[in-house]
UniProtKB/Swiss-Prot annotation:
The gene is HOL1. One of its GO terms (molecular function) is polyamine transmembrane transporter activity. It is found in: Membrane. Residues 88-103, 152-189, 241-362, 435-448, 499-508, 566-586 are cytoplasmic. This is Protein HOL1. It comes from Saccharomyces cerevisiae (strain ATCC 204508 / S288c). The keyword rRNA-binding does not apply.
């Protein structure tokens, strides 16, 4: 039993990994097969099964094809969620739809993104990942069509609700799909591309929509989205492979840590009291009064996280483990099936659906979820502010920008976001591995937070340069550099938020991202309604000084989390394990 890979081990701490095999794991053999590792000796986490249908065993081209589709979904939904501004002048002039109504539509969009993420998430655990992409793309197509035909205020508001729902699949489902096909040590780089795609859609979407509106008319902003949504929907239906795979049913190299016997095709646990065995593992460290963990944490404090007596933790009964090496690759029609029923689906899954909703909401009790949500959410708030400032200030003297000039202001922000993604993603992957090598191979989730230092300095500096520069009419070069700094903080913070949370609770990726999306988009919704009033009441310069202070303050939360993060993960371990067992036992 290895404490870094087996969550039943009494010394297991979520978010603490050993990038190299420990002595126990190196000697652990099942069917004469050692643990799977990279060519450089990094242990693959999670350990793949022997089945050709395991997404972790997909060929490189299959992974790249799926990754490319997920990247396009992310970029496209981000773009459609930010393109309405290109049509607001025309809607105001032709139909008298006020700018306040457009802001209301933006607020509704954020609510649609955040809360539909929660209500759609259980479908991924019941009917596979693919169905959510189909539902979201279909609703996005409908929202774009409604916007293309908009003539009334209600059209501009309610169409944005459907557009927001369409982006919800990129808030949590995409990350889940990517974690299905990539290993732990690859997620930093993968998330970098994810955040870059979000950046491209967020910053280039308004630019492209502006050109479409200028060269045709504002309705084509919606019609182009309809056309692309239709093509994307067809691609998803016929080309998107399902990544749901119940690895718990299959033998992996880690099953060498279990007692069992070989019967030719299966491995069956010889201990028929799986529940009591798991209880012994959990209670050994977690239920002993005054038991002390690493850094002197009193584990008895976790008692407050115990499940109520009337709420049973359902753990699947002991079952035979399948030797996946004897399976054949599924035929293509089954690999792209619209629905892939979960192995634990009961009937139509109505009761399970509401149980999954409850489990998702449990993640609000985990401090790293709040840190991730605030990191991501506050950057979206700044996005709202500087886009509003661009639209309200730069059409007027002394700037006198055209629609194209204002749209071009998104380019330096995009460049900064790409650099931030690379810094917090690819560079951080090498950095955390370097840190782990100097820590006896032990990788802590908090290593990712080192890169918050750059965000805490560069982000506020960018807000000050843009805000004060706009108010005092500085040269455009200083203002554009400020926008680049803001973009850097946007990309860097997003990457840190996603990677840190996925490292902290690797078996609850979807649930964590759902709560992060709710926090993020609820914060964004609130500030969408207050942005214009704040700028009008305090003025551009004072508003951006306040935003810079808020940026630094929220980013500074990374410091106590770095020092106390492992203690918090240990403190929430029992609740985490119970949540995983509840989900897997639904």
């Amino acid at each position: 039993m290895d404490k870094y890979t087996n969550r039943d081990h009494p010394d297991y701490i979520p978010g603490t990994f050993n990038i190299y095999s420990s002595q126990n794991l190196e000697n652990g053999i099942i069917y004469e097969s050692k643990l799977k590792k990279t060519s450089s000796g990094v242990v693959l986490i999670p350990q793949p099964s022997y089945s050709p249908n395991d997404p972790l065993n997909w060929s490189s081209w299959r992974k790249l094809a799926h990754f490319g589709l997920m990247a396009f979904i992310t970029a496209f939904t981000a773009a459609t969620s930010n393109d309405a501004g290109a049509a607001q002048d025309s809607l105001n002039e032709i139909y008298g739809i006020s700018y306040d109504s457009m802001n209301t539509g933006a607020g509704v969009l954020f609510l649609g993104i955040g809360w539909s993420t929660l209500f759609l998430a259980p479908f991924a655990n019941l009917y596979g990942r693919k169905i959510t992409y189909i539902v979201c793309t279909t609703l996005g197509l409908f929202g774009a069509l409604w916007f293309a035909l908009a003539k009334r205020t209600s059209d501009t508001i309610w169409s944005q609700l459907f557009v927001g729902i369409s982006e919800s699949c990129a808030e949590a489902q995409v990350q889940l799909s990517l974690s299905d096909i990539f290993f732990q040590h690859q997620l930093g780089s993968v998330l970098t591309v994810y955040i870059m795609c979000t950046s491209i859609g967020t910053f280039l979407g308004p630019l492209i929509a502006g050109y479409i509106s200028a060269f045709t008319n504002f309705r084509w902003v919606g019609w182009v989205a309809v056309i692309i949504s239709g093509g994307l929907l067809i691609t998803i239906i016929f080309g998107c492979e399902e990544t749901y795979f119940d690895r718990g049913q299959y033998m992996t190299p880690l099953t060498s840590c279990q007692s069992g016997y070989e019967d030719g095709t299966t491995l069956q646990n010889s201990d028929n009291t799986a529940v009591s065995r798991r209880k012994r593992h959990l209670d050994a460290k977690l239920s002993t009064p005054g038991a002390m963990g690493e850094k002197g944490v009193d584990l008895s404090e976790t008692a407050e996280f115990e499940v109520n007596n009337e709420e049973e933790v359902t753990i699947p009964e002991t079952r035979e483990l399948i030797d996946g090496s004897k399976e054949h690759l599924k035929p293509y029609p089954k690999r792209v099936a619209i629905l892939t029923k979960a192995t634990n689906l009961k009937g139509y899954g109505f009761k399970q659906y509401f149980k999954y909703l409850k489990i998702n909401l449990r993640m609000f009790l985990f401090p790293p979820v709040w840190l991730s949500g605030m990191f991501w959410g506050i950057q979206d708030v700044f996005l709202t502010f500087y886009l509003t400032t661009q639209e309200s200030a730069y059409y007027e003297p002394p700037w006198n920008y055209s629609d194209f000039g204002v749209a071009i202001m998104n380019v330096p922000t995009l460049i900064g976001a790409v650099i931030g993604c690379i810094c917090a993603g690819i560079v951080s992957d090498y950095f955390v591995l370097w840190m782990a090598r100097h820590n006896r191979g032990i990788l802590e989730a908090e290593f990712r937070l080192y890169f918050s230092i750059a965000t805490a300095i560069i982000g506020p500096a960018g807000l000050l340069m843009f805000g004060i520069g706009t108010a005092r009419q500085w040269p455009w070069q200083a203002i554009y550099v400020g926008l680049g700094f803001v973009g850097f903080a946007w990309g860097c913070s997003g990457d840190i938020a996603m990677a840190y949370l996925m490292d902290c609770y690797p078996d609850m990726v979807l649930e964590g991202m759902v709560c992060t999306a709710i926090i993020n988009n609820t914060i964004s919704c609130i500030f969408t309604f207050t942005c214009s009033d704040w700028l009008a009441a305090s003025g551009t310069e004072n508003t951006y000084i306040a935003l810079a202070v808020i940026n630094f303050g929220i980013t500074a939360f990374a410091l106590p989390m770095y020092y106390y993060g492992k203690r918090i993960r240990l403190w929430t371990k029992r609740w985490y394990l119970q949540s995983v067992n509840l989900r897997d036992g639904v």
